[in-house]
């Protein structure tokens, strides 16, 4: 259950980060309206706050989060960008998520 809680929180965190970076990309690369920078800033602030909800040390949290970020970014690639995933994408995400689980579920020192 702990792994599920961590993964869901990381997934929300990743979506907040991706939205916060994707909206400025739309403004700068596709000429979308500048007002999109406001929700982008709010999304990045949400991203930073969500990272603080994890009890682990910041560096460990960021390291474990990276695995989930990779998987969520690939889901974004498929659903938002409409790009089909390759077996290499799926395999890489599986490896990254395994790494996240190893880091996030390590025994706690007393």
Curated annotation (Swiss-Prot):
Q: How does it sit in the membrane?
A: Multi-pass membrane protein
Q: According to its UniProt record, where is this protein located? A: Cell inner membrane
Membrane-spanning residues where?
8-28, 33-53, 65-85, 88-108
One GO CC term, this protein = plasma membrane
Record's InterPro entries? Answer: UPF0060
Keyword Nucleotidyltransferase found:
no
Spell out the Pfam families in the cross-references. UPF0060
**Keyword Cell membrane assigned:** yes
Q: Which UniProt keywords apply?
A: Cell inner membrane, Cell membrane, Membrane, Transmembrane, Transmembrane helix
PANTHER family per record: UPF0060 MEMBRANE PROTEIN YNFA (PTHR36116:SF1)
Instruction: State the HAMAP family in the record.
Output: UPF0060
- Please identify the protein, giving its name as recorded: UPF0060 membrane protein Rpic_4131
């Amino acid at each position: 259950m702990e792994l599920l809680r961590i993964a869901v929180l990381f997934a929300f965190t990743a979506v907040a980060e991706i939205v916060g970076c994707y909206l400025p990309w739309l403004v700068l690369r596709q000429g979308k309206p500048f007002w999109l920078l406001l929700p982008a800033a709010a999304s990045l602030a949400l991203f930073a706050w969500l990272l603080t909800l994890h009890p682990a040390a910041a560096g460990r949290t960021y390291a474990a989060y990276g695995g989930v970020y990779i998987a969520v970014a690939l889901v974004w690639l498929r659903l938002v960008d409409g790009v089909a995933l390759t077996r290499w994408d799926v395999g890489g995400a599986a490896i990254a998520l395994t790494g996240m689980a190893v880091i996030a579920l390590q025994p706690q020192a007393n």
